[in-house]
Amino acid sequence: MAHHSCGATHGVMERCDLACTSCYLGEEANASRPIEEAEVCRQFDALREFLGPQGKAQITSGEVTLMPREELGRYIRYAIDIGLDPMVMTHGRRFLEEPDYLRDLVELDGLEKISIHVDSTQRGRQEWSPFCTETELHPLRDRYARLIRDTRRQTGRRLHAAHTVTVHPRNLAQIPDVMQWMVRNLDAFRMISFQPVAEVGRTQDQSIENLTLDDVWEKVCGGLGTKINRDAMHFGHPECHIVTPVVVVRSGERFIVLETARKGKRWDRSYLRRLLDQVGGYTVRGKSRMTNILGITSLTLRNPLLLLETFLYGIYRSWGNRRELASVLLRAVKRGHLSVRPLVLVIHKFMSPGELDTPIGQERLAACTFKVPVNGKMISMCEMNATELRSKLYPRERIRKAG
């Protein structure tokens, strides 16, 4: 079974064609050539050893879609072949300009996961202005949602999409607007990650003084119209991130958010734990929907008591939300449409340089669940970006490429 953590590449393509006002890359990034393919594969090998089978590996660096599709495709195929679950991290501009680029990654190279970064820090986009709001970027987000739907339809393949948003002083109050857009587009995106600014790399935006995870979480909940338990699941240090899965039942503009583990509800947590113990090792990559349904059903049938509990728990949860569900279902009867979609809510708070050597910073580094392979070691992404380590790698990478 895979470790409960995530890893990432570096040096694959440090260059980026945007000039985001919040950027973890160093000043020399755009002059740094990509490292050799063999070295990238060694990074994947290290990630596979560290993360285990189906480990979540982000193919990231600067903007990796600046590479030829064939080259990025080779990295995706290699990661899959050695047993990783790769996700391409991108601002996605090339996908809009060349839709075939994404289609080929999905159809020819087996890509199943992407994360698209859109927010008001992204200087260089045609849609960007110094004072643009997140709401003004919704038409751009709509284009990506259509692209994802079109790619699935044209290829007949699975494509899971996440949305990444940097949180800075100017857009903190706009998070509810982004969440409301997200609810309307859960058929395209099923995960959203908010990442408060860290004063690293070539970042120009200031971090928000004394901003806590709870401050951001309050804005997320505001957009969903309900207070959600932030402690449904735990990964790493509690000051690093929040990861909370929910289910959204929606008809038109009316929706209800169903939590996986409500605060103070013991049965929620104990049932979730037993369910994950039973099916947590099952992987869906490379299998058809029917195969996955049969596989998960088979696992559940091996534990008749859990199957019975699932039935009873479903009644219990439906009764607890009967009024809200009735309102949505009545709307669905009138409109003839009802959707039930999963949504994973993520907040990831990277550290600035001044935080690393504090007692809490050292605790966070020791508990880190997001690492990159550097010189034979797995290094926290915070250590990679909040020190000179990333920049120190640039000259060596150029020398290796030239040699």
Where are the regions a protein language model picked out?
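A short acidic (Asp/Glu
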Residues: 68-72, 98-101, 127, 172-178, ...
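Conserved C-terminal portion of the radical SAM core fold
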Residues: 55-58, 110-115, 139-239
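Radical SAM enzyme core and accessory elements
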Residues: 1, 252-403
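Short amphipathic alpha-helical segments and helix-helix/interface helices
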Residues: 73-77, 102-106, 145, 179, ...
